[in-house]
Amino acid sequence: PLNFGVAEEEAKERARKALKLVGLPEDLLKKSPFDLSGGQMRRVAIAGVLAMKPEVLVLDEPTAGLDPRGRREIMDMFYQLHKKEGISIVLVTHSMEDVSQYADKIIVMHRGTIYKEGTPREIFSSPKELVELGLDVPETIRFQLKLEEKLGREIGKPSLSLEELVSNLHLLKTGETGYDG
């Protein structure tokens, strides 16, 4: 913020607020970058951007290289920034787990052009089509497709979460389809 003419005291206040937004303690400002974990370094970098008060964050593979816990924490943080602070987030990722759980809208690119766009439910409603194109689908859907192949029948609508898959399996057991229509 100082480079954009923000007064020093306001810049410090923005930095403190940004650290809080990304879930880091204020005393981290006194630490050497070499003492931070990979996840903390990413959060500090994001806090630096948030101190600028952006309306939109454009993120390219922000969870690459993080362990599952770190990935979930970072994605939860982006989700909260969107919901509580009203920041629009454009996420470029190959992680279908992340988009199925966190995205409001997905744009699928294939060979440099927009192939499909919609909600996670709409995009993953025809997973076999995506797989045939060589695109990935969430792990729960991959598991569901393998299970359906073994059973020789559909379980229900594609499951975007483990909870949905369990619900679809329960519906199958009770003789229902899991489809709304």
Task: Describe every region a protein language model picked out.
Residues 10-27:
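Conserved ABC ATPase "signature" region
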Residues 32-36, 40:
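Conserved ABC ATPase signature
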Residues 53:
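Conserved catalytic motifs of ABC-family nucleotide-binding domains
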Residues 57-60:
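Catalytic Walker B motif of ABC-type/P-loop ATPase nucleotide-binding domains
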Residues 99-101:
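A short, surface-exposed alpha-helical micro-motif characterized by mixed small hydrophobic
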Residues 117-118:
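ABC ATPase "signature
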